UniProtKB/Swiss-Prot annotation:
InterPro entries per the UniProt record, alphabetical: CysJ (IPR010199), CysJ-like_FAD-binding (IPR003097), CysJ_Proteobact (IPR029758), FAD-bd_FR_type (IPR017927), Flavdoxin-like (IPR001094), Flavodoxin/NO_synth (IPR008254), Flavoprot_Pyr_Nucl_cyt_Rdtase (IPR001709), Flavoprotein-like_sf (IPR029039)
Cofactor(s) needed for function: FAD; FMN
Protein known as: Sulfite reductase [NADPH] flavoprotein alpha-component
Species of the source: Salmonella typhi
Gene: cysJ
Catalytic activity annotation: hydrogen sulfide + 3 NADP(+) + 3 H2O = sulfite + 3 NADPH + 4 H(+)
């Protein structure tokens, strides 16, 4: 097991101490790590009465292994809440991130609970990819002695809704596991379903416990003060937008903004690799258009979470208007008896296509109907914050946080449409205006603990963002490890994001190599994956020398194309077939030497 490194400048450990600590804990199981954590806590708190973590006594109910497989933090929050519920019920539980779980020990699990999200085209979260591959490989063991439960989080606006949870649930059963209870698939508004499921899990496990025993377990994983903050997704910090700068050229087809947010004296802290959550306000003009299309005024009272609000205010601040879903289309068609939409009902593929190509306001414009205000509210999904990879390191920018925002803009029959959060930041928040933010920590995208370790960064488009943070941190730490950047975009003159900074890093010697792919500057399109193949021999030398590989950006196409190129490079220059190359890359993932932040 490899524990991701915390920000060295913020901890009382130097890089060498961190490296020794990681080496000492490499072969420990989650239970052993938990015991060590409890032991040292007890050393520091001898009078606290704390109980060190120990295995469940003979004859008692076996401990519950609770695996959190999270992409944006929601699955982690559900898993942490379940852990607290189980501890309160005096049940023995170990919470472990999927990326830290030694999956080859799964055959020895008696009680296994998985909370997982889904990303991309139905793939598991990044931290759970290795576990998923192992379970679906020929090496997967029989699990006749394992009882399990799965909670799956997803988004019905995507075709492969909750696919990761479905995969884990079906495979665990296929391997002989016993279901403790049926899998639950939860949409974006997951809280109520999660609360009910957690209660069911506790009840089922308590019914299996022969004797109530004092709880003796804690969550595993690195403890880091940087995660402790009064500001959360549900209680965000009101910060100040200080800089909004367009960093693509005048003739670029893309509108990309460099956004700087002043955190003031909040004390909010983050690490390179983390994301910034941004709560946004829907465009008042869009709200007005939707309200008028439904022959409403906007001042009608509606109920939102037990409170009465004017319709327009509810739509601006509380509901998703820029992303349509198949469920919304189907429900709107059924509710309004729309002649143009009713033929789509029951046809999942057509509903998905219509939702993906027709925003809510245009659905109403194309299929007008008279709807009362509360019916409209009941049709919509709650507004959720958008996450942006952080493009700065606090070692350099201190009380600021920077993000790189690709503004979503398009036309529907001549009418300008835009993304909710991106247009909010780019167009509607004035400089020195307020924006509500929080940090979403991502321990699955961390710089190596050893500053001598080489780093390979692959980030086309706005995927460049976290690597700006990486380089700022490596510069601040005086890290001597080599750094190699692969970046791509349509045009060199218009789309070279942060060009001056990269050129400075090259000149200073911090950026050892940079390979650039401009897809539209020549007849033949060139992408970052082509550059990977072109530099295959040198790339393999870096990998063979222990380099860590990082990929950030589009999950739907780029990440898959990049992984295919990496596999081909490993196979060709590592002297392997593709199956062996895939196993090799999986090992790199387990060792945290291959990390992705894709969306």
């Amino acid at each position: 097991m490899t524990t991701p490194a915390p920000l060295t400048g913020l901890l009382p450990l130097n890089p060498e101490q961190l490296a020794r600590l990681q080496a000492a804990t490499t072969d420990l199981t989650p239970e052993q790590l938990a015991w060590v954590s409890g032991f040292f806590w007890g050393v520091l708190n001898p009078r606290s009465g704390a109980v060190a973590v120990t295995p469940a006594p003979d004859g008692k109910m076996p401990g519950v292994t609770l695996i959190s497989a999270s992409q944006t933090g929601n699955a982690r929050r559900v898993a942490e809440a379940l852990r607290d519920d189980l501890l309160a019920a005096n049940l023995n539980v170990t919470l472990v991130n999927a990326g830290d779980y030694k999956f080859k020990q799964i055959a020895s699990e008696k009680l296994l609970v998985i909370v997982t999200s889904t990303q991309g085209e139905g793939e598991p979260p990044e931290e759970a990819v290795a576990l998923h591959k192992f379970l679906f490989s020929k090496k997967a063991p029989k699990l006749e002695n394992t009882a399990f439960a799965v909670f799956s989080l997803g988004d019905t606006s995507y075709e492969f809704f909750c696919q990761s949870g479905k995969d884990f649930d079906s495979k665990l059963a296929e391997l002989g596991g016993e279901r403790l209870l049926d899998r639950v698939d939860a949409d974006v508004e997951y809280q109520a379903a999660a609360s009910e499921w957690r209660a069911c899990v506790v009840d089922v496990l308590k019914s299996r416990a022969p004797v109530a025993v004092p709880s003796q377990s804690v969550a595993t994983g690195a403890v880091n003060d940087i995660h402790t903050s009064p500001y959360t997704k549900d209680a965000p910090l009101t910060a100040t937008l200080s800089v909004n700068q367009k960093i693509t050229g005048r003739n670029s087809e893309k509108d990309v903004r460099h956004i700087e947010i002043d955190l003031g004296d909040s004390g909010l802290r983050y690490q390179p690799g983390d994301a910034l959550g941004v709560w946004y306000q829907n465009d008042p003009a869009l709200v007005k258009e939707l309200v008028e299309l439904l022959w409403l005024k906007g001042d009608e009272p509606v109920m939102v979470d037990g409170k009465t609000l004017p319709l327009a205010e509810a739509l601006e601040w509380h509901f998703e208007l820029t992303v349509n879903t198949a469920n919304i289309v189907e429900n709107y068609a059924t509710l309004t008896r729309s002649e143009s939409l009713l033929p789509l009902v029951g046809d999942k593929a057509q509903l998905q296509h219509y939702a993906a190509t027709t925003p809510i306001v245009d659905m109403v414009r194309f299929s007008p109907a008279q709807l009362d205000a509360q019916a409209l509210i009941d049709l919509l999904r709650p507004l959720t914050p958008r996450l942006y990879s952080i493009a700065s390191a606090q070692a350099e920018v201190e009380s600021e946080v920077h993000i790189t925002v690709g503004v979503v803009r398009y036309d529907i029959e001549g009418r300008a449409r835009a993304g909710g959060a991106s247009s909010f930041l780019a167009d509607r928040v004035e400089e020195e205006g307020e924006v509500r933010v929080f940090i979403e920590h991502n321990d699955n995208f961390r710089l190596p603990a050893n500053p001598q370790t080489p780093v390979i960064m692959i980030g086309p488009g706005t995927g460049i963002a976290p690597f700006r943070a990486f380089m700022q941190q490596r510069a601040a730490d005086g890290a001597e490890g080599k750094n190699w950047l692969f970046f791509g975009n349509p045009h060199f003159t218009e789309d070279f994001l942060y060009q001056v900074e990269w050129q400075r890093y090259v000149k200073e010697g911090l950026l050892s190599r940079i390979d650039l792919a401009w897809s539209r500057d020549q007849k033949e399109k060139i992408y970052v994956q082509d550059k990977l193949r072109e530099q295959g021999a040198e790339l393999w030398r870096w990998i063979n020398d222990g380099a860590h590989i990082y990929v950030c950006g589009d999950a739907r196409r780029m990440a898959a194309d990049v992984e295919k190129a990496l596999l081909e490079v490993i196979a060709e220059f590592g002297g392997m077939d593709l199956e062996s190359a895939d196993e090799y890359l999986s090992e790199l993932r387990v060792e945290r030497r291959y990390q992705r932040d894709v969306y």
